[in-house]
Amino acid sequence: KRIEKKNCMNWITKFIKPKIKSLFKKRSSDNKDALWTTCECKNLLYKDDLFNNISVCPTCGSHHKLSPEERFKIFFDNKEYTILETPLPKDDPLKFSDTKKYTERLKKAREQTNQSDAIVIANGKLEGINVTVGAQNFSFIGGSLGAAAGEAFIHGIQHAIENKNPFVFFSCSGGARMQESAIALMQMTRSVLGVHELKKANLPYIVVMTNPTAGGVTASFAGLGDILIGEPKAI
């Protein structure tokens, strides 16, 4: 009986317990409507508590990813801001396909994030000062820079210049979007020229690099701020 009990406990410990943990972790981390999430330090965190701590784990200090709207709620006075409508170029001009059609990837990303593309631009006040703010969403195809994201970035700069606002940008990207090839690479040049126009207008350009900021985004507009602020593991 002791042997049977020991074998039963081994079976529960080795097979059942890990499966339950794995299932719970998957549900808490992947379901955006879940009340709980897990940290890389393996702590289980209540999402509201995590957000109230600006999405920094109170145990290990790990910075969890924030969507653009979550950042805006933290950044702007009284959580008050206006999302700016940005130009949206034609999808998939190259008819790109790998393991999945690019149009399908865009559709899925839009459904998951409720965004038209990776960059969102907003306007609001910080300490009573009007500010134009942009942010990338890593959940939208890795926050990658394509034609639509490039248009949004330029639109943000134009809005800042027209309203004489400082421009603050939260970068979070794996780089240029490979599905758009040379079109994506062109956005690097366009964004650099846009930053140049902002500086000609003598307006502050502040970049907050978040985890991760890499590739063509680092090599273009993310590295050109008058002030560069880096969150842990940003590069």
Q: Where do the PLM segments sit?
A:
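Short acidic/polar capping segments at secondary-structure boundaries
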Residues: 211-214, 234-235
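Terminal-region recognition feature
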Residues: 2-206, 212, 224
